[in-house]
Protein backbone atom coordinates (compact mmCIF):
# COMPACT_ATOMS: atom_id res chain seq x y z
CA UNK A 1 0.00 0.00 0.00
CA UNK A 2 2.77 2.48 1.01
CA UNK A 3 4.75 1.64 -2.14
CA UNK A 4 1.66 2.16 -4.32
CA UNK A 5 1.05 5.59 -2.84
CA UNK A 6 4.68 6.68 -3.02
CA UNK A 7 5.05 5.48 -6.60
CA UNK A 8 2.82 8.35 -7.69
CA UNK A 9 5.39 10.89 -6.47
CA UNK A 10 8.84 9.31 -6.97
CA UNK A 11 10.63 7.99 -10.00
CA UNK A 12 11.14 4.34 -10.76
CA UNK A 13 14.87 4.76 -10.04
CA UNK A 14 13.97 5.22 -6.37
CA UNK A 15 12.70 1.66 -6.11
CA UNK A 16 15.77 0.19 -7.69
CA UNK A 17 18.35 2.21 -5.77
CA UNK A 18 16.81 3.88 -2.72
CA UNK A 19 14.10 1.63 -1.38
CA UNK A 20 16.47 -0.34 0.80
CA UNK A 21 17.67 2.84 2.54
CA UNK A 22 14.18 4.29 2.88
CA UNK A 23 12.53 1.26 4.46
CA UNK A 24 15.42 0.08 6.65
CA UNK A 25 17.85 2.88 7.57
CA UNK A 26 15.45 5.85 7.56
CA UNK A 27 12.92 4.42 10.10
CA UNK A 28 15.78 3.61 12.46
CA UNK A 29 17.08 7.17 12.08
CA UNK A 30 13.65 8.61 12.91
CA UNK A 31 13.33 6.45 16.03
CA UNK A 32 16.77 7.44 17.23
CA UNK A 33 16.09 11.12 16.61
CA UNK A 34 12.88 11.09 18.61
CA UNK A 35 14.68 9.49 21.53
CA UNK A 36 17.26 12.29 21.77
CA UNK A 37 16.72 15.11 24.29
CA UNK A 38 16.26 18.63 23.05
CA UNK A 39 19.22 21.00 23.07
CA UNK A 40 19.92 22.44 26.53
CA UNK A 41 18.33 19.53 28.40
CA UNK A 42 14.85 18.05 28.35
CA UNK A 43 11.88 18.82 30.53
CA UNK A 44 10.96 15.37 31.79
CA UNK A 45 7.49 14.42 32.88
CA UNK A 46 6.78 13.61 36.52
CA UNK A 47 6.79 9.90 35.67
CA UNK A 48 10.48 10.25 34.72
CA UNK A 49 11.44 11.84 38.03
CA UNK A 50 11.01 10.25 41.41
CA UNK A 51 12.28 11.69 44.67
CA UNK A 52 12.23 9.72 47.91
CA UNK A 53 11.58 11.26 51.32
CA UNK A 54 11.37 9.81 54.79
CA UNK A 55 7.92 11.05 55.82
CA UNK A 56 4.77 12.52 54.30
CA UNK A 57 5.24 16.18 55.40
CA UNK A 58 8.36 16.43 53.23
CA UNK A 59 6.18 15.70 50.22
CA UNK A 60 4.25 18.89 50.87
CA UNK A 61 7.31 21.12 50.53
CA UNK A 62 8.76 19.42 47.45
CA UNK A 63 5.46 19.04 45.62
CA UNK A 64 4.43 22.61 46.40
CA UNK A 65 7.53 23.88 44.61
CA UNK A 66 7.71 21.30 41.82
CA UNK A 67 3.98 21.47 40.99
CA UNK A 68 3.57 17.96 39.52
CA UNK A 69 6.98 18.02 37.84
CA UNK A 70 8.18 15.19 40.07
CA UNK A 71 6.74 12.21 41.88
CA UNK A 72 7.54 12.06 45.59
CA UNK A 73 7.38 8.79 47.53
CA UNK A 74 7.55 8.55 51.33
CA UNK A 75 9.49 5.59 52.72
CA UNK A 76 7.49 5.64 55.96
CA UNK A 77 3.84 5.15 54.96
CA UNK A 78 1.07 7.33 56.33
CA UNK A 79 -0.07 6.20 59.77
CA UNK A 80 3.24 4.53 60.65
CA UNK A 81 5.57 5.67 63.41
CA UNK A 82 8.86 6.93 61.91
CA UNK A 83 10.61 6.20 65.20
CA UNK A 84 9.86 2.48 64.92
CA UNK A 85 9.05 1.68 61.27
CA UNK A 86 11.41 -0.65 59.41
CA UNK A 87 11.31 -0.63 55.60
CA UNK A 88 10.39 -3.63 53.49
CA UNK A 89 12.50 -4.74 50.49
CA UNK A 90 9.87 -3.18 48.24
CA UNK A 91 10.31 0.19 49.93
CA UNK A 92 14.09 0.02 49.59
CA UNK A 93 13.77 -0.88 45.92
CA UNK A 94 11.68 2.25 45.35
CA UNK A 95 14.40 4.25 47.05
CA UNK A 96 17.11 2.78 44.80
CA UNK A 97 15.14 3.89 41.73
CA UNK A 98 14.78 7.50 42.91
CA UNK A 99 16.80 10.48 41.66
CA UNK A 100 17.58 11.51 45.25
CA UNK A 101 16.67 10.90 48.88
CA UNK A 102 15.60 13.68 51.25
CA UNK A 103 15.85 13.00 54.98
CA UNK A 104 14.95 15.11 57.99
CA UNK A 105 17.86 14.17 60.23
CA UNK A 106 17.21 12.73 63.66
CA UNK A 107 14.19 10.50 63.05
CA UNK A 108 14.49 6.95 64.34
CA UNK A 109 13.97 5.50 60.86
CA UNK A 110 16.88 7.56 59.56
CA UNK A 111 19.19 6.78 62.44
CA UNK A 112 18.70 3.06 61.88
CA UNK A 113 18.79 3.00 58.08
CA UNK A 114 20.82 5.93 56.74
CA UNK A 115 24.17 4.14 56.80
CA UNK A 116 22.73 1.18 54.89
CA UNK A 117 21.07 3.51 52.40
CA UNK A 118 24.43 5.17 51.72
CA UNK A 119 26.26 1.85 51.40
CA UNK A 120 23.68 0.26 49.10
CA UNK A 121 23.17 3.36 46.93
CA UNK A 122 26.59 5.03 46.66
CA UNK A 123 25.56 7.21 43.69
CA UNK A 124 22.24 8.34 45.16
CA UNK A 125 22.26 12.05 46.10
CA UNK A 126 21.26 12.57 49.73
CA UNK A 127 19.85 15.84 51.08
CA UNK A 128 19.48 16.51 54.80
CA UNK A 129 16.65 19.03 54.93
CA UNK A 130 17.21 19.95 58.58
CA UNK A 131 20.54 21.60 57.72
CA UNK A 132 18.64 24.54 56.26
CA UNK A 133 17.44 25.49 59.75
CA UNK A 134 20.66 27.35 60.51
CA UNK A 135 20.27 29.45 57.37
CA UNK A 136 16.67 30.19 58.37
CA UNK A 137 17.83 31.85 61.57
CA UNK A 138 16.38 29.15 63.80
CA UNK A 139 19.02 28.98 66.53
CA UNK A 140 16.33 29.76 69.08
CA UNK A 141 14.20 26.89 67.79
CA UNK A 142 17.07 24.46 68.20
CA UNK A 143 17.40 25.65 71.77
CA UNK A 144 13.71 25.10 72.40
CA UNK A 145 14.11 21.35 72.19
CA UNK A 146 15.49 21.35 75.73
CA UNK A 147 13.92 24.59 76.94
CA UNK A 148 11.61 23.45 79.70
CA UNK A 149 10.00 26.86 80.00
CA UNK A 150 8.20 26.03 76.79
CA UNK A 151 8.55 22.29 76.24
CA UNK A 152 8.42 20.01 79.26
CA UNK A 153 9.64 16.51 80.00
CA UNK A 154 11.08 15.44 76.66
CA UNK A 155 14.25 14.93 74.69
CA UNK A 156 15.33 16.20 71.26
CA UNK A 157 12.50 16.78 68.79
CA UNK A 158 13.23 16.68 65.03
CA UNK A 159 9.75 17.87 64.01
CA UNK A 160 11.07 21.08 62.45
CA UNK A 161 8.11 21.52 60.12
CA UNK A 162 5.70 22.16 62.99
CA UNK A 163 6.85 25.79 63.07
CA UNK A 164 6.81 28.50 60.43
CA UNK A 165 10.57 29.02 60.71
CA UNK A 166 11.09 25.29 60.29
CA UNK A 167 8.69 25.17 57.35
CA UNK A 168 10.58 28.00 55.66
CA UNK A 169 13.82 26.10 56.20
CA UNK A 170 12.42 22.93 54.63
CA UNK A 171 11.04 25.01 51.77
CA UNK A 172 14.52 26.38 51.16
CA UNK A 173 16.09 22.93 51.40
CA UNK A 174 13.64 21.54 48.85
CA UNK A 175 14.27 24.46 46.50
CA UNK A 176 18.07 24.20 46.70
CA UNK A 177 17.94 20.47 46.01
CA UNK A 178 15.62 20.85 43.03
CA UNK A 179 17.94 23.47 41.53
CA UNK A 180 20.91 21.16 42.03
CA UNK A 181 19.13 18.14 40.57
CA UNK A 182 17.36 19.85 37.67
CA UNK A 183 19.18 23.16 36.98
CA UNK A 184 17.56 23.69 33.58
CA UNK A 185 14.26 24.42 35.29
CA UNK A 186 15.47 26.92 37.85
CA UNK A 187 12.89 29.50 36.77
CA UNK A 188 10.12 27.05 37.60
CA UNK A 189 11.65 26.28 40.99
CA UNK A 190 12.04 30.01 41.70
CA UNK A 191 8.35 30.60 41.12
CA UNK A 192 7.33 27.54 43.12
CA UNK A 193 9.55 28.53 46.03
CA UNK A 194 8.10 32.05 46.13
CA UNK A 195 4.58 30.65 45.92
CA UNK A 196 5.18 28.21 48.77
CA UNK A 197 6.75 30.83 51.04
CA UNK A 198 3.74 33.05 50.44
CA UNK A 199 1.46 30.25 51.62
CA UNK A 200 3.60 29.66 54.71
CA UNK A 201 3.46 33.38 55.53
CA UNK A 202 -0.31 33.28 55.14
CA UNK A 203 -0.54 30.43 57.65
CA UNK A 204 1.58 32.42 60.12
CA UNK A 205 -0.74 35.43 59.82
CA UNK A 206 -3.82 33.27 60.38
CA UNK A 207 -2.34 31.61 63.47
CA UNK A 208 -1.24 34.97 64.87
CA UNK A 209 -4.78 36.26 64.40
CA UNK A 210 -6.27 33.26 66.22
CA UNK A 211 -3.93 33.75 69.17
CA UNK A 212 -4.17 37.54 69.28
CA UNK A 213 -7.41 37.85 71.28
CA UNK A 214 -5.96 36.31 74.44
CA UNK A 215 -8.52 33.50 74.55
CA UNK A 216 -6.27 30.78 73.12
CA UNK A 217 -4.74 28.21 75.46
CA UNK A 218 -1.13 28.72 76.51
CA UNK A 219 -0.45 25.04 77.25
CA UNK A 220 -1.44 21.62 75.95
CA UNK A 221 -0.76 17.95 76.60
CA UNK A 222 0.49 15.57 73.91
CA UNK A 223 1.81 12.00 74.00
CA UNK A 224 4.86 12.39 71.71
CA UNK A 225 6.71 15.76 71.57
CA UNK A 226 5.77 16.57 67.98
CA UNK A 227 4.95 20.25 68.52
CA UNK A 228 8.04 21.58 70.31
CA UNK A 229 8.85 24.06 67.56
CA UNK A 230 5.22 25.14 67.25
CA UNK A 231 5.13 25.73 71.01
CA UNK A 232 8.36 27.73 70.97
CA UNK A 233 7.30 29.88 68.05
CA UNK A 234 3.94 30.83 69.52
CA UNK A 235 4.93 31.02 73.17
CA UNK A 236 3.14 27.87 74.35
CA UNK A 237 3.95 25.13 76.86
CA UNK A 238 4.00 21.54 75.56
CA UNK A 239 3.50 18.92 78.28
CA UNK A 240 4.62 15.49 77.07
CA UNK A 241 3.21 12.18 78.28
CA UNK A 242 5.99 10.06 76.80
CA UNK A 243 9.01 9.75 79.11
CA UNK A 244 12.33 9.95 77.27
CA UNK A 245 10.82 8.20 74.27
CA UNK A 246 9.38 5.38 76.37
CA UNK A 247 6.18 4.43 78.14
CA UNK A 248 5.67 6.79 81.09
CA UNK A 249 5.92 5.61 84.67
CA UNK A 250 3.13 6.21 87.15
CA UNK A 251 5.18 8.96 88.79
CA UNK A 252 5.70 10.68 85.45
CA UNK A 253 1.98 10.51 84.64
CA UNK A 254 1.22 12.14 87.98
CA UNK A 255 3.63 14.99 87.17
CA UNK A 256 1.99 15.44 83.77
CA UNK A 257 -1.48 15.63 85.35
CA UNK A 258 -0.33 18.06 88.04
CA UNK A 259 1.42 20.29 85.49
CA UNK A 260 -1.59 20.24 83.18
CA UNK A 261 -3.91 21.29 85.98
CA UNK A 262 -1.54 24.04 87.10
CA UNK A 263 -1.41 25.40 83.54
CA UNK A 264 -5.16 25.15 83.02
CA UNK A 265 -4.84 22.77 80.07
CA UNK A 266 -8.06 22.33 78.12
CA UNK A 267 -6.72 20.43 75.10
CA UNK A 268 -5.03 17.02 74.94
CA UNK A 269 -3.74 16.14 71.49
CA UNK A 270 -4.16 12.53 70.31
CA UNK A 271 -1.79 11.19 67.62
CA UNK A 272 -2.80 8.16 65.53
CA UNK A 273 0.67 6.64 65.25
CA UNK A 274 1.14 6.50 69.03
CA UNK A 275 -0.63 4.85 71.94
CA UNK A 276 -3.81 6.84 72.66
CA UNK A 277 -5.22 5.29 75.86
CA UNK A 278 -3.07 7.27 78.28
CA UNK A 279 -3.73 10.57 76.53
CA UNK A 280 -7.47 9.88 76.61
CA UNK A 281 -7.29 8.93 80.30
CA UNK A 282 -5.46 12.16 81.14
CA UNK A 283 -8.01 14.20 79.20
CA UNK A 284 -10.80 12.66 81.30
CA UNK A 285 -8.84 13.13 84.52
CA UNK A 286 -8.30 16.87 84.01
CA UNK A 287 -11.56 17.57 82.17
CA UNK A 288 -9.84 18.50 78.89
CA UNK A 289 -11.03 17.96 75.34
CA UNK A 290 -9.16 15.28 73.34
CA UNK A 291 -8.34 16.47 69.82
CA UNK A 292 -6.96 14.18 67.15
CA UNK A 293 -4.07 15.60 65.16
CA UNK A 294 -1.57 14.17 62.69
CA UNK A 295 1.65 16.18 62.36
CA UNK A 296 2.87 13.48 59.96
CA UNK A 297 0.25 14.10 57.30
CA UNK A 298 1.27 15.62 53.97
CA UNK A 299 -1.15 18.58 54.18
CA UNK A 300 1.04 20.91 56.22
CA UNK A 301 -1.17 23.99 55.98
CA UNK A 302 -4.33 22.17 56.98
CA UNK A 303 -2.66 20.46 59.92
CA UNK A 304 -1.05 23.58 61.39
CA UNK A 305 -4.33 25.49 61.13
CA UNK A 306 -6.23 22.55 62.66
CA UNK A 307 -3.88 22.56 65.66
CA UNK A 308 -4.14 26.34 66.05
CA UNK A 309 -7.94 26.30 65.83
CA UNK A 310 -8.10 23.67 68.56
CA UNK A 311 -5.99 25.79 70.91
CA UNK A 312 -7.96 28.91 70.02
CA UNK A 313 -11.21 26.94 70.51
CA UNK A 314 -12.41 27.81 67.03
CA UNK A 315 -14.58 24.98 65.73
Which ranges hold each PLM region?
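Extracytoplasmic metal-acquisition and chelation regions
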Residues: 35-315
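N-terminal secretory signal peptides that target proteins for export/translocation
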Residues: 1-17
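N-terminal compositionally biased, intrinsically disordered segments and leader/signal-like regions
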Residues: 3-5, 21, 25, 35, ...
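Bacterial N-terminal signal peptides
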Residues: 12-13, 17-37
Amino acid sequence: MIRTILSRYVSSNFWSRGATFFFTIFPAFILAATALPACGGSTASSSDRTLAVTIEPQKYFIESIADKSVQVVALVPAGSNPEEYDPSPTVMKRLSEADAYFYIGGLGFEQRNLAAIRDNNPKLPLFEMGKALADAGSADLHGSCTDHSHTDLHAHDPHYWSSVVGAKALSRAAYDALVELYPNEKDKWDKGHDRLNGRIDSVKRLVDTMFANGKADKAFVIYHPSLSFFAQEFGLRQIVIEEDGKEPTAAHLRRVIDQARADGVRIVFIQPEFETRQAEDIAREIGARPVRINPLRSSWEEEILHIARALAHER
